From Swiss-Prot:
Keywords: Glycoprotein, Host Golgi apparatus, Host membrane, Membrane, Transmembrane, Transmembrane helix, Viral envelope protein, Viral matrix protein, Virion. One of its GO terms (molecular function) is structural constituent of virion. Homomultimer. Interacts with envelope E protein in the budding compartment of the host cell, which is located between endoplasmic reticulum and the Golgi complex. Forms a complex with HE and S proteins. Interacts with nucleocapsid N protein. This interaction probably participates in RNA packaging into the virus. The lineage of its organism: Viruses, Riboviria, Orthornavirae, Pisuviricota, Pisoniviricetes. Residues 237-252 are annotated as: Interaction with N protein. It is a multi-pass membrane protein. Pfam families: CoV_M. Its main location: virion. InterPro entries: ALPHA_CORONA_M (IPR042551), M_CoV (IPR002574). Glycans are attached at N32. The chain crosses the membrane at residues 48-68, 78-98, 113-133. It comes from Feline coronavirus (strain FIPV WSU-79/1146). Residues 19-47, 99-112 are virion surface. It comes from the Viruses. This is Membrane protein.
Amino acid sequence: MKYILLILACIIACVYGERYCAMQDSGLQCINGTNSRCQTCFERGDLIWHLANWNFSWSVILIVFITVLQYGRPQFSWLVYGIKMLIMWLLWPIVLALTIFNAYSEYQVSRYVMFGFSVAGAVVTFALWMMYFVRSVQLYRRTKSWWSFNPETNAILCVNALGRSYVLPLDGTPTGVTLTLLSGNLYAEGFKMAGGLTIEHLPKYVMIATPSRTIVYTLVGKQLKATTATGWAYYVKSKAGDYSTEARTDNLSEHEKLLHMV
């Protein structure tokens, strides 16, 4: 594949101008004429020249990038998932810095059209970055969970049991929620949320918080085996509003706990 790219580069770039040639017995050198020993040649500063010299490095970088994107999930590896989150957090400030630097460099050489595009890119990048922070703060306000600042988190499932609030990040808001109890361990969406629970500890309602509202899911059915603390409970949407998902331990009724506002 490397030689195919180099041959194509030679065909495109050798038509005119000063050329670089990849020699059989020497490194890259600039020549002004045709040399029979030249395998491939290409125009100085061309993208193909960059690929010809850095294709292996870029292939390694892209392999790592694809691996992080493909397997950057908690069920595969928390380490890879952490690297993925770090990359996503750093992309916004890096892109913003690049657009600002490009705007400055274009202004210095009086290329005002590109300067305008660079400024527009910087403004859009900054606006999108601020939108991420606003939505994350809104979600944190409802859940008090640091999962709110995960770039992939669009909603958070909150289950109150034993006076604590157990959370699980979600991609969206489902129609129903199923909680599974296996030998005292509570699971949702295939992930373990809590341990040491019994049938009596399963709540009458669960909540899913989004940046704009909190959706309450009410228990409509369950099947449990008391001897092994195993079973399931199913919840469906019942109402939505500006509710907090924090667990309450004071002397309030179930209805009051449900409706206490942020």
